Swiss-Prot record:
Protein name according to UniProt: Beta-lactamase
EC category: hydrolase
Keyword match Hydrolase: yes
Binding residues annotated for substrate, in chain numbering: 251-253
Alphabetical list of NCBIfam families matching this protein: bla_class_A (NF033103), classA_firm (NF012167)
InterPro entries on file: Beta-lactam/transpept-like, Beta-lactam_cat, Beta-lactam_class-A, Beta-lactam_class-A_AS
Note: The class A beta-lactamase family has a specific amino-acid numbering system, sometimes called Ambler or ABL numbering and often misspelt as Amber. A multiple sequence alignment was used to derive a consensus sequence and then the consensus was numbered taking into account insertions and deletions. This allows use of identical numbers, e.g. for active site residues, despite differences in protein length. UniProt always uses natural numbering of residues, hence there appear to be differences in numbering between this entry and some papers.
Record keyword Ion transport present: no
Active site: residue positions: 89
EC number(s) on file: 3.5.2.6
Subcellular location field: Secreted
Keywords: Antibiotic resistance, Hydrolase, Secreted, Signal
Protein origin, superkingdom: Bacteria
Provenance organism: Bacillus subtilis (strain 168)
Length: 306
C-alpha cells in the first residue's frame, strides 16, 4: 500500500540521518557532546518505536494515529499525530466533560426526559428509562461507561448540538476537532470526509485538559475520571496493553472502515499519569476492526514510557 511505503521510507530516512550523526556529522553546533548524545539517543529510540507502529500497521492492514503524554517527564510519543480519523464514540467523554464544566454539581441531578423517538441504535441504558427519564449525571455516566448513543446525543444537545460541542473544545484550545453530526451518523468515517474527525494529538490534549489540568474543578475531575475507570467497553483496548498494576480509565469508539479508537488516562503506581490516544482505521467500508491492534499499540507506548 502507498500509505505503508511512505511510513517505511520515513523510518529509513530517520535512521539514515541518525547514522550520519553517529559517524561524525552533528547538527548540534551549540550543544555539548553530552547533550548531543542525549538527543541522538532519544531520536533513535523514537525511530525504533515508530518502526513498531509501522509493523503493526502492516500486520493488521490498518492505519494508526498515536499520541501519548507522560505527565511526569513531559515525554511524548507521536505517530501520525496530526492525521485525521473519525473520532466515533470517544467524543462522549469530552462532551460529558464539557457538560460538567457548564453545569453545577446540583444541576447535574436534574432529570432529563426524552421520548421513544429520541432513541437511536445501541442505547442499552436510556432505553430502560423512557418512563422516568434520567438525571444529567446518569446520562453522562451512561455515555461514558456504556457508550449509550442516545445519551451521547443528549449530551450534544445540552451543549447546543455538534456546533456547540465544537465551540466548547475551541474554548480549551482545540481548533482541530470538527463536530458536525449526531449519533449514529457521526460514525460513517468516510475517507477524506473531515466531519466528526479529530487527531490523536488533539484528543489526547483535550483529555489532559479536562482530567488533569484546571479546566474542571477538582470534584468534577474526580467524577469524570471515576466514570472512565468504570468503562465497560475498553477491557480489550488500552487496558489490555497496560502493565499489570497500572490503572486505566478510557473511552472507546468504533465506526465504519474498521475504525477503532481508545483514549485514556493511565495511572502507573507511584508516579504521574500518562495520557494516551490511539486511533485506527482500515481501507474498506465494511472492514472489521481488531481490538488487538489497539492493545498492541498501547503496549508499545506504555513499555516505552516505563
Amino acid at each position: 500500500m502507498k500509505l505503508k511505503t511512505k511510513a517505511s521510507i520515513k523510518f529509513g530516512i530517520c535512521v539514515g540521518l541518525l547514522c550520519l550523526s553517529i559517524t561524525g556529522f552533528t547538527p548540534f553546533f551549540n550543544s555539548t557532546h553530552a547533550e548531543a548524545k542525549s538527543i541522538e539517543d532519544t531520536n533513535m529510540a523514537s525511530c525504533i518505536t515508530n518502526k513498531k507502529f509501522v509493523q503493526l500497521e502492516k500486520k493488521f492492514d490498518a492505519r494508526l494515529g498515536v499520541y501519548a503524554i507522560d505527565i511526569g517527564s513531559n515525554k511524548t510519543i507521536a505517530y501520525r499525530p496530526n492525521e485525521r480519523f473519525a473520532y466515533a464514540s470517544t467524543y462522549k467523554v469530552l462532551a460529558a466533560a464539557a457538560v460538567l464544566k457548564k453545569n453545577s454539581i446540583e444541576k447535574l441531578n436534574e432529570v432529563i426526559h426524552y421520548s421513544k423517538d429520541d432513541l437511536v441504535t445501541y442505547s442499552p441504558i436510556t432505553e430502560k428509562h423512557l418512563d422516568t427519564g434520567m438525571s444529567l449525571k446518569e446520562i453522562s455516566e451512561a455515555a461514558i461507561r456504556y457508550s449509550d448513543n442516545t445519551a451521547g446525543n443528549i449530551l450534544l444537545q445540552q451543549l447546543g448540538g455538534p456546533k456547540g460541542f465544537e465551540k466548547s473544545l475551541k474554548q480549551i484550545g482545540d481548533h482541530v476537532t470538527k463536530a458536525k453530526r449526531f449519533e449514529t451518523d457521526l460514525n460513517s468515517a468516510i475517507p477524506g470526509d473531515i466531519r466528526d474527525t479529530s487527531t490523536a494529538k488533539a484528543l489526547a490534549t483535550d483529555l489532559k485538559a479536562f482530567t488533569l489540568d484546571n479546566t474542571l474543578t477538582t470534584d468534577k475531575r474526580m467524577i469524570l475520571t471515576d466514570w472512565m475507570r468504570g468503562n465497560a467497553t475498553g477491557d480489550e483496548l488500552i487496558r489490555a496493553g497496560a502493565p499489570i498494576g497500572w490503572e486505566v480509565g478510557d473511552k472507546s469508539g468504533a465506526g465504519s472502515y474498521g475504525t477503532r479508537n481508545d483514549i485514556a488516562i493511565v495511572w502507573p503506581p507511584n508516579r504521574a499519569p500518562i495520557v494516551v490516544a490511539i486511533l485506527s482505521n482500515r481501507f474498506t467500508k465494511d472492514a472489521n476492526y481488531d481490538n488487538a491492534l489497539i492493545a498492541e499499540a498501547a503496549k508499545v507506548v506504555l513499555n516505552d514510557l516505563k
